[in-house]
Amino acid sequence: MLTDTLHEAWTAMRYNRRSAALTMLAMAWGIATVVLLLAYGNGCAQAMINIFASFGTKTMILVPGRTSMQAGGQKAGAALRFTLDDVDLLRMNVPQISRITPEVYKSSTIQYESRTFNFGVVGDHPNVASIRVLVPAQGRFYNIEDQLQRARVAVLSSEAKEKLFSGRNAQGECIRIDGLSFEVIGVLSAKMQEGDDDINRIIYVPFTTMGDLTDIHFLDSIGFNYEVNDYQGLERAVRAVMAIQHKFNPVDRHALSVYSVMDQIRQFRGMVLGFKILLALIGTITLATGGVGLMNIMLVSVAQRTHEIGMEKALGSRQRDVFFRFLTEALTISFIGGVLGVMLAYAIAHSVGRLTLYSAMAKHAEAGDIRLLIDPGTLVIAGLILTAVALVSGMVPAIRASRLDPIEALRYE
């Protein structure tokens, strides 16, 4: 029965080749639009994941502030001051932490020959390279020996190197930081940078050497990474430990600011889901245009074959047989158009390659380049949308054909 129905649908399509071909093209363009829009949403999501990964996904930064609640006998408004004791406290009491570093920041005058700039200088332990995913593009990062020897060595971020040295080689050269000479031992790869953000203008020096530039007794922040998945539970544990040490309420967000990359990723995923739903709706509207064309073509086909339908009913064809024959014809046209549309989408995605729509708004955004990612989930969603549109578009003419009165249909010329 199904084979006969498919054969009849194929015969009808061959009889109306031009109309069927145009309808297939409309459905192909519609499904290609759906697939490409969903692929663009996937590409945006993957690009942002790459950007977050370049900063270290499982990373937290602790920044001291001022209390806004009374706790432990302390009045609100007391300032928190981090020291190296806090680093040791966290290392011993929070086993989920894998690497941790103190951090001291200073805005300094940087000189090389006749060039002078004001850049941020940061003193960290050598493991900051792993914590913040600092990848040298040239040379190396400072190590534990440099730290122990208080070596005056510096690692330049990409934009700092360009401003100081332009296209010249920086490795092995000496720069002056607040009048003190430092040897450049490495240059970092560029990171994602929005607007006037200075992440690519920072200069890194060993934490002990930073003591030659400023007081390192009190820390500006503490950074660490971890391996567990429950980052919210880890944040609560960190707040509890620090609250006991500094006598503040653990829920006081003003006393201790915790910046978590995973928390930003969670918020971003919600935004991406809404974005992908919007793109799917736009694609569905485009595909629905092809569905309207399919419905019109099928209605014309019903009108042209009214006498034929009456003859079949007179010979014993049931109402449901006529209904399924026209519905199968509509689904066949949609299926062939869908296959052509997916092939078109793959061809466009392959030829376009990388899109730099996001990069155009940011500096050094190689990680933010967008690829059109067509995954199995995209094809499943597109297939479901195509099936829904095809069913809605095909049922109207199928119902009309199945309800034709055979006597009236036989009279139709």
Question: PLM features: residue spans?
Answer:
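A short amphipathic helical element positioned immediately N-terminal to and/or at the very start
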Residues: L2-R14, D86, L90
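Short cytosolic juxtamembrane segments of multi-pass membrane proteins
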Residues: T3-H7, A398-E413
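Transmembrane alpha-helical interface segments in multi-pass membrane proteins
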Residues: T5, R14, R18-A26, T33, ...
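Generic structural signal for small/hydrophobic residues in well-ordered secondary structure
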Residues: N16, C44, L62, L90, ...
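Hydrophobic, regular-secondary-structure patches
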Residues: N42-G120, N127-S130, K163, G211-D212, ...
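Short helix-coil transition/hinge motifs at the ends and kinks of transmembrane helices
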Residues: S68-A76, E194, K247-D252, L355-L373
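Mid-to-C-terminal secondary-structure elements
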Residues: P126-Y142, D146, A151-N249
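Peri-transmembrane interface segments
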Residues: G223, E235, N249-G283
